[in-house]
């Protein structure tokens, strides 16, 4: 089902793998590769062959030409002719440049490898950072594993890497394992197997080499092989039913490479302290013969103490080759290891034929990767591949789908993103390191998601003292809720994966205070086992990457769902498969690709708006674009005026003009209709008897809403000497009809002014007060409202320089003269708002009236009010709303469906919603500055709508099939 939802069709993981396999090489290509391999083997000396077995360390950071590390790297490549390098920390361009440099220096192409368990970001900055494998396991969706493998391989190849040391095929069924933990997909061997297969196929589809690790399984160990030799005291039956299951699946999926682990398994290898990586019984007999693997075998790093505590450099290299390994990874001394191998051949312990077998596999992989023809990477292509929006969108989608809510006492979550009652939040970051930046991104994300909350922050890490903990506990008493973000990660060689004791004691004391505590595990999911008491809410996020922290901040405040299922058991607390589900209730910010749109197409919005500003269609604009559950574009352009320094932002407040009609007056009418207080077919005089003058007695509410009431479009009261609110009211009430009601449609401000008075009469409240209490506050539109006249406000985007009536720049007061005479509050104009606030309103409309966990409007009410009432006489008019014109000009452009509904405002504002595509486009401008005579904006509205519609690539959800070519 999940695969179907992701647009991959209802395929099994096996069929997904078949779909993903690259096309078979032609017979000629296979023959050409084989000839090249044979030719190299024929010409290589024994010493050169041995050199091909080594993969050495390289750093993708800048190093001067005389840097000792760089010089040693070059020496090993040029003199020892090593077969490959393994890149560690670096940045994209530096690594790619160095990879090209080293390839040029090497006689044979180098096989370049890298650890990429959570993307290239595991080693290289500014690349796509994916959630850890256990997070993918929590989604239950192998399509995500495939996508991560594919994207990681694409980015790796762009940076000169061919072999990925990923995925981890270990089954993490030991809560105290200090080194695997979230690096594994879970504790169920069949889930792990499915995810491993998908990842391997994704890597292969992108043209790279996957390497499953750590054979025969590092998941149920209590020792880190970086520090010592872990022991797996299990019999063969246990290994067959647990540890070996994912490796069998990977081999069945055609994995090209396997990494053997430094693991002691007495049931398979009785020799004391002999790890699997050096054991012929395990590497050759089990992996190669019994499991039928004939690909490349790579040892885990030979510099790790799981080997070095028991074997010297030379002996370890010889034993690895005796065992059946092909690549000797990170030997501490290549020269000594090579000498030992030569000596072993001289004494008959090893044969040259044995060396040839491994070198042949290495060369075959290099040829398969086409390195014999092209070994360099194109630096100009890196920005087109690495960390691009589609890749980041996949990371974000996985992070969101993985979030696992295991405890939610008192329904403390979700928190309202716009609180009706002020609540003080304290965010405490608990770190097992000394990095002062820990938690900063999460706090920033919370402030972006919920800017109305006062948020205090504290960091407690390994440097903290007793006084620091005491101070935070005191601070917590002054807050309403505490969010604790626990950053406890797997760290090679640390030998631990637990909360530091001081952190544990602090958490227990904090929970004992009685304030609600939300604990989020950004890393080790087992940390709750260290506590004596339980927090109100416990969220497992598995990872500490930006996408995960962003997703967690959204989910805490209802902007993302909780749907992940625990892929492990937390003994005494939670079972595998546990996970409470909470839906998303308010819109979230997202990458366009997350809702079936292309970022590349939406980037053209920038060009359109910037060109319009240059052509003086308007000084500034704010745009909000949303689809499905997300806002994908929220941006300001230009300035308040052509000569001002103040820039437009999504929070800039605009005069909405006639958008007031739909956001306030029509919405209020919908609410009163649902409450049974407003009969659409009742005459207006039922609610407003004084309206029954000069033939208007039979005008209905429906006719006011559909602009078929027979009323004049407007009257220029300010030019007629009618400049008091009461005089305007009396003039409208006594006005005569200009056509028979119901026979035609003439857009009328007067009808919506009257409807505003009807709403006030029914509710007993002024229109602005009703809207604040029943529309803006429930929708979280905190910067929306009517504004009194006579109080200019320079923080509001200005409209016109009025040279006729008010004789000043209109800024912070309603532009419409009639609304201004009426005191700034009217049913047709007067509302001020932001693109961000209107996006919440539009979200509610495309979400069938639901927002914030409540039904704000019924779906059938929305359909009633947004469907044309009488195409013959009312044209495209619905109730309050306009709909898309089937022909001719439409501000909704050419492609919005005929079910689309929207409205425009005289000041240069517009809102269009397409329910078929679950799409909305909001454009706010001040095109009337400096004068209303400017009409250039009329071309911008449909052009924007067309650009947005053309960005659609599928249903409003992540479509992996469309994103992964």
Set out the residue ranges of the language-model regions.
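Short, conserved catalytic-motif segment at the N-terminal edge
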Residues: 594-656, 677-679, 686, 693, ...
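Active-site-adjacent structural elements in enzyme catalytic domains
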Residues: 92-111, 140-158, 360, 364
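Second-shell residues forming the walls of enzyme active-site clefts
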Residues: 45, 85, 95-110, 120-122, ...
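Preference for extracellular/luminal or secreted protein segments
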Residues: 10-75, 289, 310-590, 598
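Short, surface-exposed loop or secondary-structure junction motifs
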Residues: 641, 694-898
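Short, gly/Ser/Thr-rich active-site loops of penicillin-recognizing serine hydrolases
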Residues: 350, 355-360, 364-372, 456-464, ...
């Amino acid at each position: 089902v999940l695969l179907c939802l992701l647009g991959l069709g209802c395929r099994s993981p096996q069929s997904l793998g078949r779909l993903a396999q690259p096309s078979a090489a032609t017979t000629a290509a296979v023959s050409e590769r084989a000839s090249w391999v044979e030719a190299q083997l024929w010409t290589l000396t024994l010493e050169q062959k041995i050199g091909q077995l080594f993969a050495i360390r390289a750093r993708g950071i800048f190093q001067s030409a005389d840097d000792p590390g760089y010089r040693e790297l070059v020496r090993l490549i040029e003199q020892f002719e090593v077969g490959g390098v393994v890149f560690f920390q670096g940045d994209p361009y530096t690594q790619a440049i160095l990879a090209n440099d080293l390839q040029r220096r090497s006689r044979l192409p180098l096989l370049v490898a890298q650890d990429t368990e959570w993307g290239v970001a595991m080693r290289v900055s500014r690349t796509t950072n994916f959630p850890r494998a256990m997070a993918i396991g929590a989604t239950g969706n192998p399509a995500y594993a495939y996508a991560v493998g594919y994207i990681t391989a694409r980015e790796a190849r762009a940076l000169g890497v061919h072999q990925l040391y990923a995925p981890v095929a270990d089954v993490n069924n030991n809560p105290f394992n200090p080194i695997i933990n979230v690096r594994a997909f879970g504790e169920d061997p069949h889930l792990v197997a499915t995810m491993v297969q998908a990842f391997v196929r994704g890597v292969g589809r992108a043209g790279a080499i996957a390497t499953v690790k750590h054979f025969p399984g590092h998941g149920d160990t209590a020792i880190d092989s970086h520090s010592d030799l872990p022991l797996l005291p299990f019999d063969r039956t246990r290994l067959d039913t647990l540890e070996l299951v994912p490796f069998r699946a990977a081999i069945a999926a055609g994995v090209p490479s396997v990494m053997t682990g430094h693991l002691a398994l007495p049931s398979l290898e009785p020799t004391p302290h002999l790890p699997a990586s050096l054991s012929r019984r395990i590497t050759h007999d089990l992996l190669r013969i019994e499991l039928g693997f004939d690909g490349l075998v790579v040892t885990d790093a030979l510099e790790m103490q799981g080997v070095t505590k028991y074997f010297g450099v030379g002996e370890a290299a010889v034993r690895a080759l005796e065992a059946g390994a092909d690549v000797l990874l990170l030997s501490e001394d290549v020269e000594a290891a090579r000498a030992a191998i030569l000596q072993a051949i001289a004494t008959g312990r090893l044969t040259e034929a044995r060396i040839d077998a491994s070198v042949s596999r290495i060369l075959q992989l290099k040829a398969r990767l086409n390195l014999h023809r092209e070994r360099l990477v194109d630096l100009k292509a890196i920005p087109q591949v690495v960390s691009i929006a589609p890749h980041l969108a996949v990371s974000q989608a996985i992070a969101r789908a993985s979030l696992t809510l295991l405890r939610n006492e008192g329904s403390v979550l979700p928190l309202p993103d716009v609180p009706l009652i002020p609540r003080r939040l304290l965010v405490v970051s608990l770190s097992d390191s000394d990095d002062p930046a820990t938690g900063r991104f999460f706090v920033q994300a919370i402030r972006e998601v919920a800017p109305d909350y006062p948020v205090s922050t504290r960091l407690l890490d390994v440097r903290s003292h007793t006084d620091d903990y005491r101070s935070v506990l005191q601070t917590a008493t002054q807050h309403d809720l505490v969010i604790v973000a626990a950053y406890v990660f797997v760290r090679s060689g640390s030998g631990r994966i637990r909360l530091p004791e001081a952190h544990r004691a602090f958490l227990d004391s904090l929970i004992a205070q009685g304030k609600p505590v939300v604990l989020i595990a950004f890393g080790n999911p087992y940390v709750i086992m260290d506590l004596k008491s339980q927090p109100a809410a416990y969220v497992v996020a598995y990872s500490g990457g930006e996408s995960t922290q962003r997703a967690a901040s959204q989910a805490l405040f209802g902007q993302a769902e909780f749907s992940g299922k625990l892929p492990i058991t937390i003994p005494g607390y939670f079972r595998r498969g546990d996970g409470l589900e909470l839906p998303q209730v308010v819109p979230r910010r997202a990458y366009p690709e997350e809702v079936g749109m292309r970022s590349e197409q939406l980037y053209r919005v920038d060009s359109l708006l910037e060109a319009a500003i240059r052509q003086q269609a308007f000084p500034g604009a704010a745009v909000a674009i949303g689809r499905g559950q997300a806002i994908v574009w929220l941006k300001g352009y230009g300035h308040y005026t052509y000569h001002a320094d103040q820039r437009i932002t999504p929070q800039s407040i605009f005069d909405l003009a006639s958008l007031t009609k739909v956001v306030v007056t029509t919405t209020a009418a919908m609410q009163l209709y649902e409450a049974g207080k407003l009969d659409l077919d009742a005459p207006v005089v039922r609610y407003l008897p004084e309206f029954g003058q000069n033939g208007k007695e039979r005008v209905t509410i429906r006719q006011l809403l559909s602009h078929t009431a027979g009323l004049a479009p407007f009257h220029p009261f300010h030019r007629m000497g009618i400049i008091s609110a009461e005089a305007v009211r009396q003039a409208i009430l006594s006005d005569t009809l200009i056509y028979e009601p119901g026979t035609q449609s003439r857009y009328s401000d007067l009808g919506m002014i009257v409807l505003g008075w009807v709403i006030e009469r029914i509710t007993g409240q002024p229109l602005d007060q009703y809207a604040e209490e029943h529309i803006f506050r429930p929708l979280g539109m905190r910067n929306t409202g009517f504004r009194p006249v006579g109080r200019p406000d320079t923080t509001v985007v200005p409209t016109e320089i009025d040279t006729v009536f008010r004789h000043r720049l209109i800024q912070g007061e309603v532009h419409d003269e009639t609304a201004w005479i009426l005191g700034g509050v009217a049913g047709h104009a007067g509302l001020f708002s932001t693109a961000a606030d209107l996006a919440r309103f539009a979200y509610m409309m495309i979400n069938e009236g639901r927002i914030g966990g409540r039904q704000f409007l019924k779906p059938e009410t929305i359909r009633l009010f947004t469907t044309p009432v009488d195409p013959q006489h009312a044209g495209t008019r619905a109730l309050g709303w306009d709909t898309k014109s089937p022909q001719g000009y439409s501000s909704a452009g050419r492609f919005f469906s005929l079910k689309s509904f929207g409205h425009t405002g005289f000041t240069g504002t517009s809102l269009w919603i397409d329910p078929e595509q679950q799409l909305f486009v909001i454009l706010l401008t001040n095109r009337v500055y400096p004068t209303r005579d400017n009409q250039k904006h009329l071309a911008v509205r449909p052009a924007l709508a067309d650009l947005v519609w053309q960005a659609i690539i599928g249903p409003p959800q992540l479509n992996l099939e469309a994103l992964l070519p």
